[in-house]
């Protein structure tokens, strides 16, 4: 007889409050929604939605990533979200707006971008 495979089923958690972590770089935007303990509920990124190359860094890609995450989080029963934004990317505002437009209530917006006390040398600017 064939052995039954041990597969993990996705458990639908009922999480009414959560934290939305928006990580924007110059190349991509990653949106993760966690519960209050920091356990990931859902995540998405511009690259995961099929955007490639320079299209990943657009505000539109960030908007779609945030919409996808918001819909998935609302399936888990999420209503209110606190937002932490990291990074200098172009998708910052677009991601927040689309979270709000999708129906999640944003209770707080915090910018938690790490600022060096003159640590590593930044990359040289591109020359046109």
Swiss-Prot record:
GO molecular function, one term: rRNA binding
Ribosomal protein listed as a keyword: yes
Function: Located on the platform of the 30S subunit, it bridges several disparate RNA helices of the 16S rRNA. Forms part of the Shine-Dalgarno cleft in the 70S ribosome.
InterPro entries xrefs: Ribosomal_uS11 (IPR001971), Ribosomal_uS11_bac-type (IPR019981), Ribosomal_uS11_sf (IPR036967)
Organism, as annotated: Aster yellows witches'-broom phytoplasma (strain AYWB)
Highest taxon above the source species: Bacteria
UniProt subunit comment: Part of the 30S ribosomal subunit. Interacts with proteins S7 and S18. Binds to IF-3.
Gene Ontology CC terms, in alphabetical order: ribonucleoprotein complex; ribosome
Keyword set includes Nuclease: no
Keyword set, alphabetical order: Ribonucleoprotein, Ribosomal protein, RNA-binding, rRNA-binding
GO biological processes: translation
Transmembrane regions listed in the UniProt entry: none
Annotated family: Belongs to the universal ribosomal protein uS11 family.
Protein name: Small ribosomal subunit protein uS11
């Amino acid at each position: 007889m064939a052995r039954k495979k041990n597969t993990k089923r996705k458990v639908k958690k009922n999480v009414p409050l959560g934290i939305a972590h928006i990580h924007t770089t110059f190349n991509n935007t990653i949106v993760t929604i966690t519960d209050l303990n920091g356990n990931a509920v859902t995540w998405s990124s511009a690259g995961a939605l099929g955007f490639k190359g320079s299209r990943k860094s657009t505000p539109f890609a960030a908007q779609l990533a945030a919409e996808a995450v918001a819909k998935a989080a609302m399936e888990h029963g999420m209503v209110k979200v606190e937002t932490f934004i990291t990074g200098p990317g172009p998708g910052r505002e677009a991601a927040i707006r689309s979270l709000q437009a999708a129906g999640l209530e944003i209770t707080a917006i915090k910018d938690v971008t790490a600022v060096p006390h003159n640590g590593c040398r930044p990359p040289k600017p591109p020359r046109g």
